[in-house]
């Protein structure tokens, strides 16, 4: 059975290492018969969450703000798997990904108990060095508290310049992880 997969790509580099990893993942997932939609968050107009608590009143437009999140919300609702992809910035995910993820709270506001939709997820990250521990802690904590199930993590270190991920085993790991989803 085909799965709906969305990739929230928080990298500002169109041809960077995070994008190389997500491309490998998407190729594997599509070869396994899944539908993949990728959002390049840095190229979208996404306002930050303002904590207004006015989300969830209209399930079709869950956030009070109107911007490019309107493209992400329906895909997120339909997704079986959410891929969180980001370069490692100051031992965390990029602001682009954090901003978009914060805005997904509007979907939880549609539920009277603020429950998030149950999803499976993947974490994909690239970094100049290593030091993924803080991001992994955030991701594991997120999984636990919103009730998602992790399908895996691809953490590719020591990739500074675009193209550095080529030939690294993490590229095949991303492909194989995508291919394993069905």
Where are these regions (language model features)?
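A generic structural signal for short coil/turn motifs at secondary-structure boundaries
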Residues: 13-16, 130, 161-165
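Structural signal for conserved beta-strand scaffold positions within catalytic alpha/beta enzyme cores
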Residues: 38-40, 65, 123, 152-155
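Cofactor-binding loop segments of dinucleotide-utilizing enzymes, especially the Rossmann-like FAD-
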Residues: 10, 41, 125-128, 156
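Short glycine-rich anion-binding loops that position phosphate/pyrophosphate groups of nucleotides
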Residues: 88-90, 128-129
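Glycine-rich phosphate/pyrophosphate-binding loop and the adjoining helix
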Residues: 31-32, 140-182
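N-terminal beta1-alpha1-beta2 submodule of the flavodoxin-like/Rossmannoid cofactor-binding fold
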Residues: 1-85, 91-106, 168-182
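Catalytic nucleophile loop
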Residues: 83-86, 120-122
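Short, glycine-/small-residue-rich phosphate/pyrophosphate-handling segment
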Residues: 95-96, 110-153
